[in-house]
Amino acid sequence: MKKLHIIITGKVQRVGFRYWLHQIANEKNVYGWVKNKNTNEVEALLLGKDKNVDELIKLIRKGPSSARVGNLSIQNYQKEYLRKSFDILHD
């Protein structure tokens, strides 16, 4: 099981990035959440089988056609996360 906390920079807000990520995370059976940050970045938590999370990261690096992904900051997530869904969080 892989657990990653990521920050995505670039043109990733107001382009449907969170909804796109929600859809592909569900297709890949990856759990966690995604939300916009006040810094025009997108933050996400990804949990799932190593292969599924790795495939999702590759897709995130490309992003949807409306986005321009600049950089991905990836850190291992150490805390426990019990939800078995992928959610879009709103502030």
Question: Predicted segment positions?
Answer:
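Intrinsically disordered, low-complexity, mixed-charge
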Residues: M1-D91
